[in-house]
Each structure stands twice: as C-alpha cells, then as structure tokens.
A protein has these predicted regions:
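Aliphatic-rich helical/repeat scaffold segments used for oligomerization and domain docking
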Residues: 1-272
Length: 272
C-alpha cells in the first residue's frame, strides 16, 4: 500500500519528548533534503516536509507520542500517506482534528502470552509444562514488554528453567526488578509514563498504589486519596486514560470498579 517507503520515529528519547523541529529535520533528511536546505523555523520545516510528501504514498509511524501538539506538524497534507500514531494518553485532539480511527489495544490472552514467550525464546520452552508458562505469563501481567523481558532473561540464563524464573517472580518485592534490565527496561517505561502525568495525577497514582488489593471501588479510592468521590473519580479516570488503571465493571451501587496490573501497582508504591 505504501510503495514510496516508510518513516519511523520514537517520539521519546532518553525519557524526554522530542521537539517537532528535531523530528522534522530527521524526516527531511530521510526524504533526501540536504542539510543546508532545511529551514530553521519549525513552520517552514513543516511546509517543506508536506511538499516533499505531496503525491507520495508513505507510511509514517509516530511512536510514543505524548500530545497532539507534538504530532500536529508531523501529519502530511496529502491524503495518500498513512499515519500510525501510538501513545498512552493526550491524543484526544488528534481524533477531533482529522479522519482518525482509534484502536485501543487490550491485554494479551493467556494463550497469546505463552505464544509470545515461545517466540522470544525461539521455541526453547517447547518441553516446558504449559501450566508453568501460563503462570509465568500471569506474573508478567500479560504485558508484552514484561513478557519480552522474561523471555530475554531465560535466553541469557540458559541454565535457568521457566520454573526458576517463576520462583523468582513470585516475590512481589522483586518482580519489577527481575523484569527491568537494560536501557529500555520495564521500570524505565513505567517511569516515563509517571513523568508525563500532572502533579495531581502523579500523586494520586502513588497513593492509590498503597491499596492492599489490585481491585478497588470508587469509595475506597476516594478514602485513599482523602477527597470527594467526584474529585477521586476525575483523578482515577485520568489514570485510566493513561492506561495505568483499567475499569473492570461496576459495584452493587452502580459505581465503577478499577483494577491495577500488579507490576504497575508495585511501581506506583515506589513512585513519587
């Protein structure tokens, strides 16, 4: 569908959002623009970028976007290009500004998680008891990055069995650390999400992590945050928007119930 190529950029570098000007400079160079022909002003860069894309069929992937303001100037003027934007929150303005299809990615199923583990370990887990792999996947909360980390741990410690890693992950105080190795670790990803929260929402994230159970209702949330139900719901919904909490139903009085993924709850407790 896109014979003229692809452009890809991770919009966060070393935990910080890239400025649109820097992204435009990189894209213009990728499109063959000599460095001395790239304008200084960001609006001029955007105009040149759109003229370069005019009439072309290019797939543009903008990964880890933090806001509509960050991606606005990166959208092509031509209807022949495709744009894939990924992000956790802050992109509602994008939905309102263009012909956009929103796809929310849910959690992997147990079978999908096991399949991912087998793929990462190059099928070295073929002889492993399927129930052990399902337990390992559950301890990773079926989060792809956590599953990848677990698979890499098993690959780098080939004398370990899946049971060995399961035993290490059963300790809730060590689970996040066990799955956080390297520059692009699970903890660093969670840290970036936390840093992108407003001060009030970040404080709520930390305090809600102190709740003893993964699942809680609005009344418990309000009590934990020492605020009204309306204020608590607003703060909690911000965390839902950021995919840090999930809605799992309603209580007997019609209020929402929320659930942490355990790894995020451990991170929230230590954040702040």
């Amino acid at each position: 569908h896109f014979p003229d190529g692809q452009l890809f950029i991770d919009l966060q570098e070393n935990g910080l959002p890239l400025h649109p000007r820097e992204v435009l400079h990189r894209f213009l160079r990728a499109l063959g623009t000599p460095a001395d022909r790239i304008p200084v002003g960001v609006e001029e860069c955007a105009a040149l970028y759109r003229s370069k894309l005019d009439g072309r069929r290019v797939l543009i992937t903008l990964d880890n976007a933090v806001s509509f303001a960050q991606v606005r100037l990166l959208l092509p003027g031509s209807g022949k290009c495709g744009v894939l934007v990924t992000g956790r929150d802050g992109l509602n303005d994008l939905l309102e500004s263009s012909d956009t299809l929103r796809v929310r990615l849910g959690a992997l199923s147990s079978d999908e998680s096991v399949s991912m583990l087998r793929s990462i370990t190059r099928d070295s887990l073929t002889a492993t008891d399927p129930e052990t792999l399902r337990t390992l996947a559950a301890l990773c909360d079926h989060i792809p990055l956590a599953l990848r980390a677990a698979g890499i741990r098993l690959q780098s410690r080939q004398h370990w069995s899946a049971d060995d890693l399961v035993a290490r992950l059963r300790d809730p105080e060590q689970r996040l650390a066990e799955l956080s190795h390297g520059e692009n670790s699970l903890r660093s990803r969670f840290d970036r999400c936390f840093q992108n929260l407003s001060t009030r929402v970040a404080a709520a994230y930390h305090r809600l992590g102190s709740i003893d159970t993964p699942e809680f209702d609005l009344t418990t949330g309000a009590k934990t945050l020492s605020t009204t139900s309306a204020e608590a719901e607003d703060l909690i919904e911000r965390l839902v928007d950021a995919h840090l909490l999930e809605v799992v139903g309603r209580d007997a009085w019609g209020g929402f119930r929320y659930r942490w993924k355990e790894l995020l709850r451990f991170h929230a407790r230590a954040a702040g």
